[in-house]
Amino acid sequence: MLEYKYMNSDSMNLKEKKEFGDKARVAREKLSLTQTDVAKKANMTVNYYAMIERGEANLSFEKMKSIVKVLKLKITIS
């Protein structure tokens, strides 16, 4: 299981967005899921999910939780 450490703040900085996107991509590939699979299960568009993987999207904590659940990631909040 991959782990992502979320720093509790109002918004993620560019480095944090990229780190989360990279972890999401690795986890998705390990589960043999497509971006479309994850997007549908997490209730978001494929384009938005692709932006998350590239570290380009502003990501709410609720959306992050949806992705974490689909990808079976562990999240630590500090």
Regions found by a protein language model. Give the residues of each.
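Short alpha-helical DNA-recognition segment
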Residues: 32-51
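Short alpha-helical segment immediately N-terminal to, or the first helix within
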Residues: 16-17, 27, 33, 41
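The DNA-recognition helices of helix-turn-helix-type DNA-binding domains
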Residues: 45, 56, 71
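Short, basic-rich loop-to-helix N-cap that marks the start of a DNA-contacting helix
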Residues: 56-68
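Residues in the helix-turn-helix
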Residues: 48, 58, 77
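Residues that mark the N-terminal boundary/hinge immediately upstream of a DNA-recognition element
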Residues: 23, 34, 60-63
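N-terminal flexible/basic segments that precede or flank functional cores
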Residues: 1-22, 30, 66-74
